[in-house]
Amino acid sequence: MVSVIPLTGLPEVQPGDDLAALLGDAVDRAGGLEDGDVLVVAQKVVSKAEGRVEQTDDLVAAILREARAVRRRRGDLVIAETQHGFVCASAGVDRSNAPREGWIVLLPEDPDASAARIRTGLGERFGRGPAVIVSDSFGRAWRQGTTDVAIGVAGMQPLLDLRGERDARGYELSSTVIAVADELAGAAELVMGKANGVPAAIVRGYAAPPGDGSARELVMPPERDLFP
C-alpha cells in the first residue's frame, strides 16, 4: 500500500541553511526512513536554501532573464522555456512564498544536483539515502488547474518504460512510458499544498525505478514536439 507522510515543523528556510539537516530533523519527527522511501521536496525551500531569491520591482524582466525562449505571451502572462528546458508559466519565477514583500523566488540552477545533495546528506545521517524529487507546480496545456511535477531527481529513474511488455490481455505495449517522478510529485502535493506550510513529504510503499536518472528526461525532445 502506498502512503504519503507529510514532514512538518520545518522552520522558514533562509539562504545558506543546510536543507538536508532540516529535512533530516523532520524525518526523525516522522519516525525515520524505510527502504524504498521517496522524499519529495518543494522547489521553493530548495531555492531559498540555495539563495535563489532576489528583490525586484520588475517581475517580467526577471522572467525574461531566466527564460531561454518565450513560447507564448499575453500581457504579463509569459509561457517560457527555462534554461533547464522546462516549459512553464513565468519561467518558474514566482512571488508566492517569497521571503518578503517585493522579492521573488527563482528555480534552482540545477535541480538534479539539488536533489542529489539532499539525498547525500540524508544518506550520511540515516545510513540510507532515499530517492529524492524536487517538485514544482506546473499548468498543463488544454487542462484547468496545476499539478506538481518533478524538476529534479536523484536516486531513481523518472520514467518507467513499459514498451515491449504485455497488458492483461496479452497485447504488446508499443508506446507506454509512465512519468512516475511526476506522479510521485503529484501524490506528495496532496499533503503538502501551497498554503499548508508543509514543504516536503515521504511517499512510502511504491517501488520507484532504481537508477541515477535526471528530471530532464521528462522534457519532450524537440524532434517529437508537435507544438513547438
Per-segment meaning from a language model:
Residues M1-D37:
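N-terminal glycine-/serine-/threonine-rich phosphate-binding loop
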Residues V13, D17-A21, P108-D112, A116, ...:
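Electropositive phosphate-/nucleotide-binding environments in soluble metabolic enzymes
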Residues S3-L10, Q43-K48, V53-P99, F126-P228:
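A structural signal for small-residue-enriched, beta-sheet-centric alpha/beta enzyme cores
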Residues S90-R117, G121:
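Intrinsically disordered, low-complexity linker/loop segments enriched in Gly/Pro
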Residues D17-A30, E109-P130:
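Phosphate-interacting basic helix/loop segments used at nucleotide- and nucleic-acid interfaces
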